[in-house]
Amino acid sequence: MDITSVTVGLPVTDIEASCLWYGAVFERTEPDLEPEDGVAEYEVGGIWVQLYEDDSAEENPVSVRFGVDDVGAQHARIGSLGIDIGPVECVDGAVNWFDVRDPDGNVLSLFSLVDETGRGSGRDNGADRAL
C-alpha cells in the first residue's frame, strides 16, 4: 500500500464555532478547504484535519497528537487565547506534552520530543521569537 495522504476526521456540533476555535489554535484565518456544507479542512504538518458536523460529536470524542518544536511556547500561545488547557506534563528523557479540548470534547495533544540532555528537541527553542 502506497499511502499518499492522511486525513483525520473530528466530529463537531457547530462548524462555524469550531472553525473559529481551530483557526485560532492553528493560526489560520480560514480553513484550507470547505468541500461541502458542514465540512472544513486544515492542512497541518503534512496531514489534513477534517472537521465535520455531527450532532452526536460530544458522545465520541477523538484524540489527535501533534509534534511541535517548542511545546512550552505553544502552551503559552494557546493559553493566551483564553482557551482552557492542561499543564505541561513531562516524561523524563522522552517527551513534554499538554492536552487541550475543543468545544466538543475532542482532544488535541501537543508534544515536543526531549533529547538526551533532558531539553527540548533542539530544533527550535523559540528563544529568538516573540509570542
What residue spans do the PLM features occupy?
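N-terminal beta-strand motif that seeds the catalytic metal site of vicinal oxygen chelate
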Residues: 1-19, 46, 62-64, 114-131
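Core segments of cupin and vicinal oxygen chelate
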Residues: 2-5, 9-49, 55
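Vicinal oxygen chelate
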Residues: 4-13, 43, 56-131, ...
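Alpha-helix boundary/capping residues
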Residues: 22-25, 78-82
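Short linear motifs in intrinsically disordered
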Residues: 26-33, 65-67, 87-90
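Short polar/acidic secondary-structure junctions
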Residues: 54-56, 90
